Design a protein with these regions (language model features):
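Ligand-binding pockets and gating/stacking loops
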Residues: 1-171
Length: 171
């Protein structure tokens, strides 16, 4: 009974987060005009969205609804602005080409520029670290759930990787 209540409360938390994202958007006409959103229920914050998706994977594993899941943190040519990461400006794809720092390459938005390759690489590394932190949060969440004397993490195989070792060189 306790396990079922714990599981159902986790589902309710996800539902509350989805409802909050909708209410926040509706309460701010300015925000509503500025954002082009994929649909209702998706949080404004990319971190909130990512955590919500990871939480749904946790819930699916916990309920034994699936034994396999894939999740792409971001695709390689993402033009998502990463300004939500402290100390970062520009898009993920542009930052991956950190050796080109003048803001005039086909991968840049034509507005953002950086003072050096080192500055741009530092920002790229901050975004990469942010992605790692999201995976760390997911692993901690799996580790926090006990099933049959073991954590859900102990009963899982997690593979985390990237399609490239160097985004600038496409290698």
């Amino acid at each position: 009974r306790r396990k079922l209540e714990e599981y159902l409360e986790s589902i309710r938390r996800v539902e509350r987060r989805l409802a909050f994202a909708d209410r926040r958007l509706e309460a701010s006409p300015k925000l509503k005009r500025q954002l082009r959103r994929p649909g209702p229920g998706i949080p404004d914050s990319h971190q909130d969205y990512m955590r919500l998706m990871l939480e749904m994977i946790v819930l699916a594993f916990w309920a034994d609804a699936t034994r396999i899941s894939t999740f792409m943190l971001d695709h390689g040519q993402s033009n998502r602005y990463c300004n939500f990461v402290d100390g970062v400006k520009g898009t993920w794809h542009a930052l991956s080409h950190w050796r080109d720092y003048d803001g005039k390459t086909e991968d840049d938005d034509g507005i953002t520029s950086w003072s050096s390759a080192e500055e741009k690489q530092r920002m790229y590394n901050l975004v990469t670290r942010w992605h790692h932190e999201q995976v760390g949060w997911f692993l901690e969440r799996l580790a926090s759930i006990r099933e049959n004397g073991k954590s859900l993490l102990d009963q899982s195989m997690i593979v985390y990787g990237s399609s490239l070792s160097d985004g600038h060189a496409h290698s």
